[in-house]
Swiss-Prot record:
GO terms for molecular function: structural constituent of ribosome. GO terms for biological process: translation. Signal peptide: none annotated. Belongs to the universal ribosomal protein uL30 family. Part of the 50S ribosomal subunit. The lineage of its organism: Bacteria, Pseudomonadati, Pseudomonadota, Alphaproteobacteria, Hyphomicrobiales. CDD domains: Ribosomal_L30. Gene3D superfamilies: Ribosomal protein L30, ferredoxin-like fold domain. It comes from the Bacteria. Pfam families: Ribosomal_L30. It comes from Beijerinckia indica subsp. indica (strain ATCC 9039 / DSM 1715 / NCIMB 8712). This is Large ribosomal subunit protein uL30.
């Protein structure tokens, strides 16, 4: 396991209302549950995949 110190900060900008349950669960997995909330996570392939799944509901603040 690598110990990466790279972090990525994301913010929820849209509501998951009317979206599939899997997208709501992904937002919760990312630590987001209300519009305007921010979460700072370790930059890993798993997190990048989750971000890609709900990219239309969030905004990446810090990171690539």
């Amino acid at each position: 396991m690598t110990t990466s110190t790279n972090r990525i900060t994301i913010e929820q900008v849209k509501s998951p209302i009317g979206r599939p349950g899997s997208q709501k669960a992904t937002l919760i997995g990312l630590g987001l549950n209300k519009i305007g909330r921010r979460s700072s996570l370790e930059d890993s392939p798993a997190v990048r995949g989750m971000i890609a799944k709900v990219a239309h509901l969030i905004r990446v603040i810090d990171g690539q």
